[in-house]
């Protein structure tokens, strides 16, 4: 018969002294497993039921809260059929920024992009952004007296210039939400899953942020 040593306070203390890391590891694995389960099983709105606004730059948490509240209000008033209208600030890396934007656009991530002029031109020249002239000609988009010069992009394949963005210098109302509009251009991602509603959001910004 195997001998069983009595469990004493000293033995428990010794056990935890040498095996504490096992319990820490167990807790970490449990947290990781829970997060993984939540991430893989949580409901995600389909592309047709959400509008995603990607903006270059870092937005403070307080400004992010204001933007989230604004977009939720717009979702209820302008996009009643949408499940999500979201804002994501994008920290642009000078070395890999263009590559990162290209990966996102190729994957159809985001719908409305607001970027500094040079990154916007680089992204749009490869055809990632939708041409806006047809929307303006049909009356679906009105830009008023905004100077659209900086929104024209030379297509890398055809060599022709197309209007692919709306300069945001005059949309100074964005500053109240922590966004610096100077020197930026906003455009519609051509591969976005919700062009009509993204266009509606762009029009709202033009009408209400000047």
Model-derived segments and spans:
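Extracytoplasmic "Venus flytrap"/periplasmic binding protein-like
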Residues: 96-157
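N-terminal Lys/Arg-rich, disordered targeting/topogenic segments
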Residues: 1-14
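Short amphipathic alpha-helical coupling segments at ligand-binding clamshell hinges
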Residues: 193-204
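Hydrophobic membrane-insertion alpha-helices, especially the h-region
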Residues: 17-40
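Early extracytoplasmic/lumenal segment of secretory-pathway proteins
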Residues: 45-117
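A bilobed periplasmic-binding-protein/Venus flytrap-type ligand-binding module shared by bacterial periplasmic
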Residues: 179-194, 208
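Non-catalytic, usually N-terminal nucleic-acid engagement modules in DNA/RNA processing proteins
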Residues: 167-177
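Periplasmic-binding protein-like
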Residues: 26, 205-210
